[in-house]
Amino acid sequence: SAILGNDAKSFDGNLGIANAYYASGEVTNSLGAVAKTLEIFKNQNDAENFLKKIKSEFTPYLEEKLSYSFDNGNNTAMSTRSLISIPLSTKWTVNTTYQYRKTENNVTNVSAKTNDFLLGIDYKFHPKISYTLDVGVTSANSNTTQYNQLLINTYFKAKPFKLQDLEIGYKREVQNFNSDLIDKQIATNNYYLNYNMGTNFNFGWFTQYFYTAQTDNNSRNLLFTSFYYNFMSNPVLKGGLNYQYIAFKNQVPTDYFSPKRFNAVELFLEILKDEKIVEAKSWFYNANVATGFQFIEDNSKQWTYRVQTKFGYKFSDRLLVNVYGTRSNIASTTAAGFTFNEVGLRLKWNLFDKPIFDLK
């Protein structure tokens, strides 16, 4: 506002205020500021693209994912996931998700299938606070068993202070990493907290805590924390140090990775060109590489690595496609000694060219 006090026709001032409102979650005020910008600067490219970004955020879309994973424990999995999201206003969104997953082991000839159905709502009852609830059912079918289990994912997201993000939630899911786990019908009740703190001098700190109570009477504590530095903003380039701690109440290594103590430390580097901000007919990408050591109970340290990549193309303001891949030998993501690999294809298509409600 001080900028506009000096020059009511300042382009940087008007669009800067629109961006500030948007970053604070005040969509209506942001739209008013960008509309004022376009009144003064007709068809200005940056302002038009900013308006497109807001409209796209509230436009119904379909997202399809196909993935294939395998590890050196002879487990393979194929998965498809379909999501339809329909914003009804700047505050309310409804969605539905269907996921099919088939897992098998080439040595034991054991296989299993799961079908997940979910319905969800999102409600933004304050510019800086939102609530999400997804409820559904998973139907599992293997060589030896068939059952249904309840799925729940619910959480609050908030921005308590500038440059800070907080998420508190509960998630109930079924262990479906491989056929043996599906056979055991283990459901997990996860209570979690995510917290990210940014700064004006490029340093950031992310922390995640999970407490998990399982239906096999086991429980888990998980702490992950990351201290990082933002080297660049376009594209985003950041790097830092990650630490992870896991502790299970009971050790059942024949069933799943469940150490009494697990510690891992790694250095990571990430580069990102965000699909949300690139213009149509542009490439986008993300790569995250990390290496370090893990310590499983009293065993000697083990070298670890992790590579995650995504590469895609935005064909238009409504359609984008990307491929992605992961390779990791970190025990906490699979099981002790495993090397996990996943490749996939993702498509996101805006069903219309604008929101289905009057965006004001």
Model-predicted segments: where are they?
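Gram-negative and organellar
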Residues: 1-360
